[in-house]
Amino acid sequence: MSVNRMKKRILLLLLVIPALIKAQDVMTETRQELTSPDGAYRFTFYQRAVGEDNAQMYYTLTYKNRPVIEESKLGVLIENQLFESALGIPNDTCHFWCENLKLTETEHQKTDERWKPVYGERAEVRDCYNEMTLKFKKGEGKGNRDGGYDKRKNYFMNIIVRAYNEGVTFRYHFPEMTNGLFLHIVGEQTSFTMPEGTMAYYERWAQGPYELRPLKGWGKEESERPLTLKLPDGLSVALLEAEMVDYVRGKFR
């Protein structure tokens, strides 16, 4: 065997091994998919193992089998240690709050109805989408009852995903805790990993001037939303935020 051929085989082996490792740490039992009514959009959710007991949430999005959002993280950043300590509830040991969420149930439903707006260009609007609700639980009921107060730590979180023919949405939903525990949200892990070569119409403030620039090299600069993007394959994407009623507005960094 020549030296060159040996180098090629070694290189091939080195390339294959990381790919196998990456595939193996995907928890296949958590993989869930949702498609739009016309089948064009496909949202895929799954978790990857982080150590022995924890897992990180990820998602991808394709349009007609073309990548729109590559593997990206899902999750919120929550700091409850001080509140839990004050109540005598065991603190979390995971690095991120969402790392030890267990997927307990997945619900699917379809909606196709019409509603009449108060004003606008159309007298009737069709509301047609497929919905998937991912239900998570945190904690295994560890703790005790002290003087009637339930000190067992059980948190619940849902991710509600809707796929329309026009696009895909998702939101975090926190059902009310039965023992009065609340959540101190300090940030998000939510990310949008776009294909290499994507360009963004950067806007520093609302109604400010637009600047077409690469996604790299922003530093600490932030862009207003919605953020319009041009993918290298010709697709255009808009990242939006909705129902800003009881939550802070976001920016893209």
Q: What is the meaning of each model-derived region?
A:
Residues M1-E29:
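Bacterial Sec-dependent N-terminal signal peptides
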